[in-house]
Design a protein with these regions (language model features):
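Helix-centric, low-specificity signal for extended rod-like, repetitive segments
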Residues: 1-2, 44
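A residue-level marker of the well-folded mature domains of exported/periplasmic proteins
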Residues: 28-363
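N-terminal twin-arginine translocation
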Residues: 3-6, 21-26
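Bacterial N-terminal signal peptides
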Residues: 12-22
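Bacterial N-terminal signal peptides that target proteins for export
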Residues: 2-14
């Protein structure tokens, strides 16, 4: 865990006239409003944590001298997280973002002790008067890249590097697989669980193992570019995660899902400052821009790009849903009927594999 950032005051300077006007809109105040962030990985992970830190910087750029932001990186989920969150709260941060699923219970516990402080927890499901939750419908992005994978694979084997067997990750695997098999019913997904959000060594080993098992396309729900770097070395292709990772694998990355928290973070910081902040539960997708994409690699055929764009348009327009039936589970049993759609409640608790995923889902 890195504490060097905890006490460092980061002030936006030289924001320019437009940003100064943005700062003025939140009202004059003697001291800057303090916003804290707790990260599960390093800001240099080039994935999940990196994108949250981009959002933190967006707050500074938008609100200028009205805010002061701090962050703590590489915080383990559990007791350490509780200690860090409490420390931020005791140091006068008026708004604290805790950006990993495993920070949920520590966030709720500390929030009870500091009822006047606002907390925002990413990907969780527990709210209170001073705790909001927010997430992105990452599964929509998985449907887009799953379509591409199904059209581009030559071996009909896709390797999927997964972090933890929680509903968010299982949803992504299933959405990817459903979309893939719509365009290529012969394709299958092999999953390797690394039980970590960020461990470049384990992620790289998982990628090698999947390629050795015949995968010619790699995707991931982990945070480092290591799987794509292995793909680049081994002459296969894949998809980035959370951020544009093409700098690490210019040939291998076909595109990447990008988590864009900027607008949400600015909106919530502004609300905390002007007094309009209220607890809420937010789950946004492609239509809001919270789920975005890197550009296509030049190697992606035009028809594949067109198919991916149609999926995006269908999701945004409401004519297509990644979990629209018929859907069969791994055992071949129908779990969603023709033209039925899995509702959010079931999606939020998803604990089964769909047809086309190999292996057992860890308990």
């Amino acid at each position: 865990m890195q504490y060097r950032s905890l006490t460092k005051k980061i002030l936006a300077i030289g924001a320019g006239a437009a940003l100064a006007m943005g700062a003025l809109s939140v009202g004059a105040q003697d001291e800057p409003f303090k916003v804290g962030f707790v990260y599960v990985g390093p800001v240099g992970d080039h994935g999940w944590t990196y994108r949250h830190d981009v959002g933190r910087q967006a707050i500074e750029e938008a609100l200028g001298d009205a805010v002061e932001s701090t962050f703590v990186e590489s915080v383990p989920e559990g007791a350490d997280a509780e200690r860090v969150i409490r420390k931020l709260a005791s140091e006068g941060h008026g708004l604290i973002f805790t950006t990993s699923f495993g920070f949920m219970n520590p966030t709720v516990k500390v929030a009870r002790e500091f009822p006047d402080i606002k907390f925002e927890h990413a990907t969780g499901y527990k709210q209170s008067d001073n705790v909001s939750t927010y997430s992105a419908r990452f599964y929509e992005g998985r449907a887009v890249i799953g379509t591409m994978a199904g059209m581009m694979t030559e071996k009909n084997v896709i390797g999927y590097i997964a972090s933890f067997p929680i509903p968010e990750v299982v949803r992504g695997i299933n959405a990817f697989t459903i979309a893939m098999r719509k365009v290529n019913p012969e394709a299958e997904v092999k999953v390797v669980w690394v039980n970590s959000w960020y461990d470049p060594g384990k992620e790289a080993d998982a990628a090698r193992a999947l390629i050795d098992q015949g995968a010619d396309i790699i995707t991931q729900h982990t945070d480092s570019p290591a799987p794509l770097q292995v793909a680049e070395e081994r002459g296969v292709v894949g998809f980035g995660q959370a951020s544009d990772m093409s700098a690490f694998a210019p040939k291998a990355q076909l595109t990447s899902i990008i988590d864009d928290w900027d607008a949400y973070y600015v909106e919530r910081a502004r609300a905390a400052i002007d007094g309009s902040w209220e607890s809420q539960d937010v789950w946004k997708g492609i239509d809001s821009g919270m789920v975005a994409f890197a550009g296509y690699n030049d190697s992606v055929p035009a028809d594949v790009q067109a198919a991916a764009e149609l999926v995006k348009e269908g999701i945004v327009g409401g004519t297509m849903h990644p979990f629209q039936g018929p859907i069969l589970n791994q055992a071949g049993e129908q779990v969603v009927g023709e033209n039925e759609v899995i509702d959010d409640e079931v999606l939020l608790g998803m604990n089964f594999y769909v047809e086309g995923v190999q292996g057992e889902l860890p308990k």
